[in-house]
Amino acid sequence: MEQPRIVNLNELPPATDREHGEKFASSHVPIGAPLGARKLGYNLTEIPPGKRAFPYHFHHVNEELFLILSGTGELRWPGGTAPLKAMDLICCPPGPDSAHQIFNNGSVPLRYLALSTTEDPEVVEYPDSGKYGVTVGRKLGGTPAESKFRVIAFKKDQVDYFAGE
């Protein structure tokens, strides 16, 4: 008989920290594997004051949901910005109308639970920079960099289908 799939967020392993430039910093604790998840991805994310976890983006395939646990912040989306506080839920279905970015505009860390479908392959677009990313073969709980195939490029650098053939 299987054991219940229960994980206490206060008893998770240490977070993996990510930082890039002046704008981006966050820590992430994957919780899908400890839960035994098979079709959904979960992680606990914390963003320090004045930072963002990720660039403004949207997914073509996967849907995301965020539950703000503590702190305050701001959601950037195609319609502008919206304030965030503890117990707010944010749903981001696939598509450009759900482009999103969470910014910690508060004075304490912003913590949230991130939940997503894990369909593969995935295509993500970054409207601010004109980039896109494609991943194929990403393992549940793995990072995009660990995918079997991954490319991040500028859309303007596209080539003709037969180029180089």
Model-inferred region functions:
Residues 79-95:
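Short acidic-glycine-tyrosine-enriched beta hairpin
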Residues 44-48, 59-77, 115-119:
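Short, conserved beta-strand element in jelly-roll/cupin
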Residues 1-39, 125-165:
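A short, N-terminal "cap"/entry segment at the start of jelly-roll beta-barrel domains
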Residues 53, 63, 70-72, 79, ...:
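A generic structural motif
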